[in-house]
Swiss-Prot record:
The gene is GLTP2. Pfam families: GLTP. SUPFAM superfamilies: Glycolipid transfer protein, GLTP. The keyword Nucleotidyltransferase does not apply. This is Glycolipid transfer protein 2.
């Protein structure tokens, strides 16, 4: 009995289970004084995006372009954070600083990095929700459906064309399910984990979108 318990405790968590742990302690603080910035912790957001990269790595080289884009945006925010970790542990302070400097909408701004990371998280959450409800559907169909509502409205023709190419490289259901933990977990457990993650992530995304709107960064587009 003890051995079985030890083996269960030793069992490696999936990326989704790790994300649940990260986001379950995520707290957004809204100040009473409206002149102060809402406090949205930066590190858990970056940790979650890093977990997305880990899943993409498991899927293989077909996701290399998306992986690189996410990684570059994470690095951009981390670099800014390191200039004053006490102040910029709050992502709203980063947006506030860039707005004051007039750089928030520049190509290499943290504002743009946060916008696209948020869209990526929204896409990921949407895809997982669809997968939870329709595990028998083809991954290509689920990815395209989710893309149309989360990313396409902000993509220009170049980005949309690139997506169509990537869509042909989407892995099959089995490969993707194994990448997010189905190899060691039952589908019922995986579905429960997905639903838990979605319930945690949805209100967080809502708060981030609200802050992006405050700083005029909710309608950015790529080429």
């Amino acid at each position: 009995m003890k051995r079985k318990r030890y083996e269960m405790e030793k069992k490696k968590k999936t990326e989704i289970q790790t994300a649940i742990e990260e986001l379950s302690v995520f707290i957004v603080t809204k100040p009473a004084d409206k002149t102060e910035a809402t406090h949205i912790p930066l590190r858990p957001i970056l940790s979650f995006c890093s977990l997305i990269i880990q899943v993409l790595d498991k899927i293989g080289p077909t996701m290399a372009v998306l992986r690189q884009d996410i990684d570059q945006n994470i690095q951009r925010l981390e670099k800014f954070y390191e200039t004053d970790s006490c102040v910029y542990s709050n992502l709203a302070e980063i947006l506030k600083k860039e707005k004051e400097e007039g750089t928030s909408k520049m190509v290499a701004s943290c504002g743009r990095a946060l916008f696209w990371l948020t869209r990526t998280m929204d896409f990921t959450a949407g895809l997982l929700r669809l997968l939870s409800k329709e595990m028998s559907s083809k991954m290509e169909e689920l990815v395209e459906e989710c893309y149309m509502t989360t990313l396409k409205p902000h993509h220009g023709w170049i980005a949309s064309a690139a997506f169509k190419v990537c869509l042909k490289l989407v892995p099959d259901n089995k490969t993707f399910m194994e990448a997010i933990g189905a190899r060691d977990e039952s589908y019922d457990t995986l579905r429960e984990d997905i639903d838990t993650l979605s319930s945690l992530l949805t209100p967080i995304l809502k708060e981030i979108y609200f802050v992006l709107e405050q700083y005029g960064l909710s309608r950015l587009r790529s080429m």
